[in-house]
A protein has these predicted regions:
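Beta1-alpha1 glycine-rich phosphate/pyrophosphate-binding loop at the start
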Residues: 8-32, 41-44, 68-82, 91-92, ...
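C-terminal catalytic lobe of FAD-dependent flavoproteins
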Residues: 12-37, 42-45, 365-367, 373, ...
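Ferredoxin-type iron-sulfur electron-transfer modules in oxidoreductases and energy-metabolism complexes
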Residues: 24-38, 64-65, 69-104, 108, ...
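Glycine-rich dinucleotide-binding loop and its adjacent helix/turn
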Residues: 131-149, 207-227, 250-314, 437-448, ...
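Feature captures the FAD/FMN-dependent oxidoreductase FAD-binding
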Residues: 149, 154-158, 206-255, 370-385, ...
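Glycine-rich Rossmann-fold phosphate-binding loop(s) that bind the pyrophosphate
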Residues: 158-162, 299-301, 462
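FAD-site-proximal beta/loop scaffold in flavoenzymes
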Residues: 261-292, 392-467
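A conserved FAD-binding loop/helix module that cradles the flavin
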Residues: 304-307, 314, 460-491
Length: 494
């Protein structure tokens, strides 16, 4: 521990965000990183705990606590305090293939488990990680390192999201020949088209993919396995196949008038914006536009927040975000102690922007849609909303939301974005390979394994565990790589 009093000597200092007025004019990332000197002070705040929950990655109660990748957080915090940035990068890359992604989009499970955060402000772990990886690129440390020996084994990975990329990176470094198939026109999966550019600029993805290509990973875009390419062909040509297709099947809602024109899934809205932004700077009008419209977002999660922020950048007339459940408390309750993940209300960037642009929080709690209203041409023009109240089922003890009779009211709306989560992977891929799925429509495997019921076919990521975080997808990719390597070589050092 380089500075035992660091957490007392220095206050937490976060990267400064651009003003709302400035940042909504474009789709760029909007934080100014701390200087190296200031970041080193933040590293000094780490207490080097005897039991570092930040990196523990463990189940506590009904919640997960700490980093799923078991990042060596106290070690690289201490190293950056000492100015040893290269050594910090070397420790970081042992456990995390893509700190350039997680330092931008991870909700920082580590910080919520930080001991400093139990009675004060947590260490700026995510910002420290960002500083380490960006310094590595600036100093030429993050460069291609192709394996010196090849095993002669060939592996096909279907899907180039975070789990597929992590598996590809691990297995390629082991010396296997890896080909990644992606049905979209660009590599990245969820990272490319599911997360807006202002949270993760796509040049950051391309930068890492270029390194992976130099190291020998082959990428084939615009190839829809299960349709363009038969599963049997891949099974015949490759020693192992890993399915990393994500949980891309959006959850729909059953509401009267759902067929109205102007109702879209959030993922389609976000993808259309990012693709048009990258293709032509949003100049050809091919994307789903919120400009001048009253927008309603159904769903209160991260994707819903991204829809709010994107709609504001389009120039929406108004934005309303519906959440069925009651508002969470502002602080931890007695049954949600540290170091559990805090079940508290948070206001994310999109909601912050809506508050400043429209003068009020876009979120409406304990409310849902009862009916959509169309004009005589089938275009959406409004919705009937209804308020809800929580009721506990006496038999199961579960909380359900019931409509409050007579609480209906109408709102004007021309664009609805459904951000109600996902229901597993699209079935044509699983059917093509003949793999079994479970009741949640995730690919079925034995507990603790990534092997499917089909010989030589494995799975990882959201397709395996269900809708989750990027950091969990990376963990899944690393785990499946270890299992595949063991099956090919008879032992593994991954």
């Amino acid at each position: 521990m380089g500075k035992p009093t660091g957490f007392m000597d220095y206050n937490r200092e976060d990267a400064e965000a651009f003003s709302v007025k400035e940042r909504i004019q474009n789709y760029n990332e909007f934080h100014t990183p701390l200087s190296k000197k200031d970041q080193e002070k933040q590293g000094a705040r780490c207490m080097e705990c005897g039991v570092p929950f930040c990196q523990a990655g463990m189940q506590i109660g009904n919640a997960f606590s700490g980093c799923p990748l078991n990042n060596l957080i106290p070690e690289w915090n201490d190293l950056i305090f000492k100015g040893c940035w290269e050594q910090a990068y070397n420790r970081l890359k042992i456990t995390n293939n893509f700190p350039e992604f997680t330092s931008r989009v991870c909700p920082a499970l580590c910080e919520k488990a930080c001991t400093c955060g139990a009675n004060g402000d947590a260490i700026t772990v995510r910002a420290n990680e960002y500083g380490i990886i960006e310094n590595a690129y600036e100093q030429g440390l993050a460069e291609a390192n192709p394996p010196k020996v090849r095993t002669g084994k060939k592996i096909a990975i279907i899907g180039s999201g975070p789990s597929g990329l992590a598996a590809a990176d691990q297995l390629n470094q082991r010396g296997h020949s890896v080909t990644v198939f992606e049905r979209s026109d660009r590599v990245g999966g969820l990272l490319m088209y599911g997360i807006p550019n202002m949270k993760l600029e796509k040049e950051v993805i391309d930068r890492k993919i270029s390194i992976m290509k130099e190291e020998g990973v082959e990428f084939k875009t615009g190839v829809n396995v299960g349709k363009d390419v038969k599963a049997k062909k891949l099974l015949d040509e490759y020693d192992r196949v890993i399915l990393c297709c994500g949980a891309s099947n959006p959850r729909d809602i059953k509401v009267k008038g759902r067929e109205a024109k102007g109702i879209y899934f959030a993922v389609d809205f976000l993808k259309s914006t990012t693709k048009a932004l990258l293709d032509n700077g949003l100049k050809d009008g091919t994307y789903i536009s919120a400009k001048g419209k009253n927008v309603m977002v159904i769903g209160g999660g991260d994707t819903g927040n991204d829809c709010v922020g994107t709609s504001i950048r389009h120039g929406a007339k108004s934005v309303l975000q519906l959440e069925m459940m009651p508002k969470l408390p502002d602080k931890r309750t007695a049954d949600n102690p540290w170091p559990q993940w805090p079940r508290v209300c948070k206001t994310d960037y999109g909601q912050e922007e809506a508050i400043e642009v429209f003068g009020h929080d876009p979120r409406v709690y304990q409310t849902t849609v009862k009916e959509f209203i169309s004009d005589d041409k089938g275009n959406l023009k409004g919705a009937v909303l209804v308020k809800l109240k929580p009721e506990k089922d006496e038999k199961t003890g579960r909380l359900t939301m019931k409509e409050i009779e007579g609480s209906e009211y109408n709102v004007d709306v021309e664009l609805v974005l459904i951000a109600a989560g996902f229901l597993g992977s699209e079935s044509y891929v699983t059917k093509a390979f003949g793999v079994e799925v479970n009741a949640r429509t995730n690919v079925a495997t034995a507990e603790g394994s990534h092997a499917t019921n089909v010989k030589n076919v494995f799975t990882a990521g959201d397709m395996h565990r269900g809708q989750s975080l990027v950091v969990w997808a990376i963990r899944e990719g690393r785990d499946v790589a270890k299992e595949v390597d063991l099956s090919l070589i008879g032992y593994t050092n991954l």
